[in-house]
Amino acid sequence: MASGILLNVKEEVTCPICLELLTEPLSLPCGHSFCQACITANHRKSMLYKEGERSCPVCRISYQPENIQPNRHVANIVEKLREVKLSPEEGLKVDHCARHGEKLLLFCQEDSKVICWLCERSQEHRGHHTFLMEEVAQEYHVKLQTALEMLRQKQQEAEKLEADIREEKASWKIQIDYDKTNVSADFEQLREILDWEESNELQNLEKEEEDILKSLTKSETEMVQQTQYMRELISDLEHRLQGSMMELLQGVDGIIKRIENMTLKKPKTFHKNQRRVFRAPDLKGMLDMFRELTDVRRYWVDVTLAPNNISHAVIAEDKRQVSSRNPQITYQAPGTLFSFPSLTNFNYCTGVLGSQSITSGKHYWEVDVSKKSAWILGVCAGFQPDAMYNIEQNENYQPKYGYWVIGLQEGVKYSVFQDGSSHTPFAPFIVPLSVIICPDRVGVFVDYEACTVSFFNITNHGFLIYKFSQCSFSKPVFPYLNPRKCTVPMTLCSPSS
């Protein structure tokens, strides 16, 4: 009898929201009491969904926050009640509907909620499939147990992925640190000459390290979060499995579907065999090339371009830059107008000369050809302005016709134009050039007395691309630039650059 009374008292001091004994109870003007944390959370939901209106979760009577009062009397009852020990059978928890006050005995399959018999007859659950909690609890217990095993397996996989990414991160750090040490050691021998190269290489490695470690750190964080998420889900399921039937069934279908549809996110990794590996250059060869380039650069002249009436190239206002355009020749016939591209060779249409003639001495200049897929440059004995449609076709690019040039076509094919053979005198002998590093800037050196024209790959430490010897300079020669069909401009570099 006394135990029954205690159960009734316990029911009276149970929070209608969390269904636990009241903690720091607060009473509303309507007389209902709630845990401080529960009614505060209810405040937030009311503010979010009901535009500031607050109402009692039990009777729906509106109230103002300032009217909420701590209920010390109820708090004292709860403290005394916690000291009383009930027998297991008498202590069985009886849960009631917060809306209707009736016992929660049914489970709504559509909403995954434990409800009372009045809820079942309400509009909210009308037509839904409802079962006694005892009928479905075992079924969902098995489903949750299966989901728990699946989740534990995925947790093991997640932990392995986390460990793998940590190991790879450490490996990358060691590898890149090792590479940086090697780079510094290799460049120490020629510090004065290769300072800029070492700095560039280290910057690349730093950037590589930054990018890779940043990506791996991000992946590591994601793996940690993923593992933590698994732990939280497992903890939630374990709590459900150890709790009451109502706790087990509340939202159970959604949790099971979320676990079944869950896929582990794999971290982004990098393949070490695909990365750029540093190779120490031929330091002696680089030193020789550097000395040669340093020597010819003493003869750097400030070259500008000379506009003419033959070329269809576009020359910039500063006379240092030239780009191509598609020329049009318009033919007028009685009553008609036809416009179509020029029939002249496109190479000819875009070739221009430097304004400075070379008749003696040594002369050097550099041309920026970065991002171009086609170009021709070198020296020329000057245009032969006869007719626009029969001059400087491709066969004209021969030393015997006054052209000492090299060129690029299709972005990767570097060639030098030599004199044609006796069998094909009107066609140049085009010799492929082996260029390991594509030049963004090409240096041209003319030694008039020695009758040589040399081309240097400035991008590759001044590597000699090609050298014409025994050139027959019978008259003044000029710098020659031809942007060809590529619309990206060619630019003459100033000596100060």
UniProtKB/Swiss-Prot annotation:
Which segment of the chain is annotated as a signal peptide?
Answer: none
* UniProt domain B30.2/SPRY: residue ranges: 283-497
- Zinc fingers, B box-type, are found at 92-133
The molecular function terms in GO held by this entry are: pattern recognition receptor activity; ubiquitin-protein transferase activity; zinc ion binding
Provide one Gene Ontology biological process annotation. Answer: positive regulation of NF-kappaB transcription factor activity
For the modification Phosphoserine, the affected residues are S87
Binding residues for Zn(2+): C97, H100, C119, H125
Which terms are listed as keywords in the entry? Acetylation, Antiviral defense, Autophagy, Coiled coil, Cytoplasm, Immunity, Innate immunity, Metal-binding, Nucleus, Phosphoprotein, Transferase, Ubl conjugation, Ubl conjugation pathway, Zinc, Zinc-finger
Cell compartments where the protein resides: Cytoplasm; Nucleus
Zinc-finger (RING-type) residue ranges come to: 15-60
Q: What class of enzyme is it?
A: transferase
This enzyme catalyses: S-ubiquitinyl-[E2 ubiquitin-conjugating enzyme]-L-cysteine + [acceptor protein]-L-lysine = [E2 ubiquitin-conjugating enzyme]-L-cysteine + N(6)-ubiquitinyl-[acceptor protein]-L-lysine
Looking at the record's lineage, which domain of life comes first?
Answer: Eukaryota
Task: Give the protein's function.
Answer: Capsid-specific restriction factor that prevents infection from non-host-adapted retroviruses. Blocks viral replication early in the life cycle, after viral entry but before reverse transcription. In addition to acting as a capsid-specific restriction factor, also acts as a pattern recognition receptor that activates innate immune signaling in response to the retroviral capsid lattice.
Q: Which family does the UniProt entry place this protein in?
A: Belongs to the TRIM/RBCC family.
Q: What is this protein called?
A: Tripartite motif-containing protein 5
State the encoding gene.
TRIM5
